[in-house]
Amino acid sequence: MTEKELGILDKKTDKELYDYQKGAIDQIFDKFENAPDDHHLLYQLPTGGGKTVIFSEIVRQYLKTHKKKVLVMTHRIELCKQTSAMLTSFGVTNKVVDSKANLDDQEDYSCYVAMVETLNNRLNDDKLDISDVGLVIIDEAHYNSFTKLFKFFDNSFILGVTATPLSSNKDLPMKANYDELIAGESIPALIENEFLARAEVHKYDMGLTSLEVGSNGDYTVKSSEDLYTSPAMLQKTLDAYKKHSEGKKTLIFNNGINTSIMIYHTFKDAGLQIMHLDNTATKKQRKQILKWFHETPDAILTSVSILTTGFDEPTIDTIILNRATKSLTLYYQMIGRGSRILNNKSKFTVIDLGNNYYRFGPWGADLDWGAIFRNPEYYFGRIKDDETIESEFRHEMPEELRQEFSNSNTVYFDIRQVYKDATFKGESSKVVLERSIEQHAKICIENSEDIYDALGLAKMLGEDIDARIEVYAKCISKSTYNFIKWLREDYRKKLNSYLRKNFDEVFEQIHGHPPEE
């Protein structure tokens, strides 16, 4: 390394490191000094914690103290450019090895930044000399595409960095490619110390059993689009936005381009400022859309997966998960887009329309990443499937409707528990719906002065009735469309009949006197 390069590395950067970042750097350098030269180390830090800042400072210090070169690998071209710019801000002169790069001057550089596929091609063509690379840094190390390049670096120290040390393929665990994990500052600690914003989650109980799982272990685009492009689902997404985040800058994640486009039209037709972005957009279009999103206070941007990494927009107030995923990494990446601190922004909103909260728990849970790294099979085995998640749903009456039943102390009826009790006693399953009808009738009568009031309230219970029927059908393992449709109609008829027949008697039991004539 030349004296000029050393002088650049010695200059003070404009990046002030936090104590937890300095601590991480010290831990990693301790491994450099004491572990074998070919050691594979994984470092975990949440999105927004400053992984790029940390490994840029590591590169700067490494080049000062080691007479070897550094290679930084990313999985997307946007990340290549951002990483190169960050390294430059730390005084590290670097060369981006892309498909158009001229490598005639590679001897002039001590640090390279490359995208995984481009690097693979250059190495297979023997176009890049890596004989003197002592440190390889892998950004977003949970992607398995990097592992095919490990064979080129048998004598290099490999440092993988990721927010979620869980492989995108459960059959290829990260512990197979990394010797150990260093877990950085947790999300709760970063929130407490005001480095990240706190998430306020609004979760919806979603019926997702129609979704299919593909070969990659996640829900297929086709089955997701079939569900999320339905008129009812599009309206639910719009209603959820209006209820929790109207007027706030919002980023929507979908599992399919068609879904995103239909969300765009649904919100546009409602008079909202929204744009759609997917991977078919040109660089110019993407730049224009992201500029608009940054500058427009109440902007809504609907997208697929293009903005899960390499995108930093601290002004985001709301994240809508208009999709389900079985990937913990994707779950954390999507929510993490809203977690950046800005001025007085200490919290942000998450609207979950994919049961992701129920599947993975709250974003920001203090997960034991060490245990997950060592035994990912145990973690995967604890993730609830959709049927289990939905079996635990408890339907709550909407607030506006609940006001109509203000005289009732409780309006909830546990179909599942009543079914279990009836089965234990050897009773017919039919008694479950009979008791449900009696309870519905009771709360109608509690809030009525005459039979006409009660019948009017019964009409308002449609959603509550349907929810009970859904649970009942699952209890008896009979859930065909026609059967459920018949049950719903029959329930309504029997409820009205029960009210007409028993109104006076039940009213007197409740109030201690008969209804007025």
Locate predicted features.
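Post-DEXD/H (motif II) to motif III coupling segment of the RecA-like Helicase ATP-binding lobe
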Residues: 142-201
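Long, largely alpha-helical accessory region at the distal end of helicase-like NTP-driven motors
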Residues: 236, 242-243, 249, 259, ...
